[in-house]
Amino acid sequence: MTYSPNIPVHPTHSQIGNSQSAAYRAPARPRTRTMARPYNISWLTPDGEERFDTVVAPALPVIESACANMARGALVATATGPVAVEDLAPGMLVITSEYGPIPLQWIGSYEMSLREAQTADRGALFRVTSDAFGLAKPAHDLLLAPRSHILFRHAKCRSLFGVDLAFAPVRAFEDGMAVFSVQPASPIAVFNLGFDRQATIKVSGIELESFHPGPHTEALIDDEMKYALLRLFPQARGLDFFGPQLINRLTTFEVRAIREGA
């Protein structure tokens, strides 16, 4: 080997470090980015005025479910008769099972895209066929969001909650005939309604839960997610705006166990 005074025979420490870092540097992990979407909201101010806004917020279940209960075309019972959900406005008197007609405080909606509709958990809607829960319940086919809750009356609810009723997720009633999941062929708007309390609204003859965050939501989400959720409710300073959860919710498993006599 020919010796050259300008080139070291043994690599220096810095050369080893540079070569090793180049050879063994772990690839950078891509940052996880949460998809966002526009949510359309309208609400009633303390002065009784109607306001509208579009809020860009994360496309995550806790946010989406706040604005997704029923699809466009659902007929909501009001003091003046059935009104399509897309034609409702804050301040209108909506018929509730517990309180009779009360002012609608908030409407949230977003457009479910075709791509989302092809995602089984988040996108699929549930078609509830006419008379699925009895005569005119519903009066006509109804499209509900995956996290919609239907008022479920059964004596076995009393052993769980002390009363014979609870809200049950629509997917608990899926049977492939009267209630089944569908994937819309085109984008479709979904809506939810909110009051200053938990309420049972009458939609096309069946009873649905209005928006309510639930008793444990605040403990289950971080401050950032809580802030994102509250941006959808300009009239509320906190999740306690919606009052206590007076009617409990059952899980899909619990509903099926009750119906099967377990």
Describe every region a protein language model picked out:
Residues 66, 81-84:
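Short, conserved secondary-structure segments in the cores of folded domains
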Residues 76, 84-86:
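A short acidic-Thr-Gly-centered motif at the start of a beta-strand
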Residues 71-78, 97-102, 106-221:
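Long beta-strand-rich cores associated with HINT superfamily self-processing modules
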Residues 61-64:
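Active-site-proximal cofactor/substrate-binding loop regions of enzyme domains
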Residues 56-59:
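Serine/threonine-rich, low-complexity linker/repeat segments that form flexible spacers/stalks
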Residues 86-93:
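Structural motif
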Residues 2-53, 77, 187-262:
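Sequence-level preference for short, compositionally simple segments enriched
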